[in-house]
Amino acid sequence: MKRAPTKQPAKPAARGGERAQGRVIAAHGRHYIVAPADGGPMLQCFPRRKKSEVAVGDRVAYERTSADQGVIVEIGERRNLLYRSDQFKSKLFAANLDQLLIVLATEPYFSEDLLGRALIAAEANELKPIVVLNKIDVEAALPVARERLAPYRALGYDVLELSVKSAPDDARTQLAPRLAGHSTILLGQSGMGKSTLVNLLVPNAEAATREISAALNSGRHTTTFTRLYPLQDGGALIDSPGFQEFGLYHLTEGRLERAFPEFRPLLAHCRFYNCHHLHEPGCAILEALADGRIAPTRHALYAQLVHEASQIVR
């Protein structure tokens, strides 16, 4: 008679003072929720230093201080870090990403400036950008939205048209294969249908959010903190609060010029190796702008971003 396999005892959770590994799955201010790597219950953690540099998606080492709390003592090596910045401060979005999914809608009217900046941030961090145009069932507003997005399609950006509320199955069919196995951050202005999209892709999202809110000891509204949801087909979806500004003051001029895909083939053809692509003679970018190969709105965005970057003392 074959003996039943011996059941292995569960690995004990880290005790006070012991270092353990985990992944940051939610953040609000200096409060973080860490999912232990050993599969134990999540716990609320705080950074050891006064200035926090922890982001959702970080692999961290922590020391438990009580049954459900700990201190983050080390951040693991990152593949990338997505954040926005102005002259005075920066706001971390998430770390260790593969893709950036930008949610737009036929209505309310979306900001093309924010779209352009999000795409630049994706390019600068070597993330695959995916643009979603939601609410295509609002037929009166659809032609204008398509016209505004046509230049981005021409640049090769993936633009998906869907209606999360009226055609959820189609939306899921389009998105699920693109998200499976990847770490994807969801960005968008308020009112674009981002929360509805999360609930479609993550069936237990509302319950998970309530659990995280309880762990943060808060009754905060569900969109006020960044959180990570594991996906059924592998990978993760990171939902970030809606925002109205996307400063990229931290990007150097060199990173900016390479973040415009239409600029890249031309960079080696400028007369001067340190060309700023603003008013220099023999600039291949300005020549392409003059003959219509580069859209005026895109070059204007580049000029604005260069100006913003120049305000930072490096």
Curated annotation (Swiss-Prot):
InterPro entries: G_CP_dom, NA-bd_OB-fold, P-loop_NTPase, Ribosome_biogen_GTPase_RsgA, RsgA_GTPase_dom, RsgA_N. It holds the Pfam family RsgA_GTPase. Its EC number is 3.6.1.-. The keyword Nucleotide-binding applies. Its cofactor is Zn(2+). GO terms for biological process: ribosomal small subunit biogenesis. It comes from the Bacteria. Residues 1-21 are annotated as: Disordered. Binds 1 zinc ion per subunit. GO terms for molecular function: GTP binding; GTPase activity; metal ion binding; rRNA binding. SUPFAM superfamilies: Nucleic acid-binding proteins, P-loop containing nucleoside triphosphate hydrolases. Keywords: Cytoplasm, GTP-binding, Hydrolase, Metal-binding, Nucleotide-binding, Ribosome biogenesis, RNA-binding, rRNA-binding, Zinc. It is found in: Cytoplasm. Zn(2+) binds at C270, C275, H277, C283. Residues 85-246 form the CP-type G domain. GTP binds at N134, K135, I136, D137, G188, Q189, S190, G191, M192, G193, K194, S195, T196. GO terms for cellular component: cytoplasm. Belongs to the TRAFAC class YlqF/YawG GTPase family. RsgA subfamily. Monomer. Associates with 30S ribosomal subunit, binds 16S rRNA. One of several proteins that assist in the late maturation steps of the functional core of the 30S ribosomal subunit. Helps release RbfA from mature subunits. May play a role in the assembly of ribosomal proteins into the subunit. Circularly permuted GTPase that catalyzes slow GTP hydrolysis, GTPase activity is stimulated by the 30S ribosomal subunit. This is Small ribosomal subunit biogenesis GTPase RsgA.
